[in-house]
Amino acid sequence: LGDVYKRQGHMVFSTLHTNDSLSAFTRLIDMGLEPFLVTSSVREVMAQRLVRRLCPNCRQKHEPTLAIREKYEGLAKSFPALFAHEPLFFEARGCAKCQHTGYKGRLGIYEVAVLNDEVADMVLHQRSPAELQQAVRKHGFRDLLEDGLLKVWQGETSVEEVIRVAGQTGIEDD
């Protein structure tokens, strides 16, 4: 039905349950859509997760582990404009205002994959999400983990929270 509206010139927004944005292409094909219909109908896909926001009243500065600092060095090279300022590393402490959780509220972490010609060709040939990720990275793609780590760098959430939500990362505390 969404494809019918799309062909009539209407923009369609939909929800699909996948682990990341790039898996949406595979999921749509697995649901029975022809690859050429996917590539002609989809402009971009976005994955999102909610992480808990550090309580501004009780968050406490801390020094990240070596593994985390090394991960940030790589991110700073890939996204220099985003990681230009000094980091604000905080950890959750807990107080009466946040009911001793260390967190108050939520914020989103996102990844957006744009379907350009190269990616469309890869979807047509049913390439894996890993191969698709290599292609979109050439155009500034940031995955959920990287966007979450940017939010850590900005002092909005903790590394532990991003790991909890975005999954295994190889940067767990030593």
Task: Describe these PLM feature segments.
Residues G2-D174:
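Short, flexible helix-loop junctions that flank or precede catalytic/ligand sites
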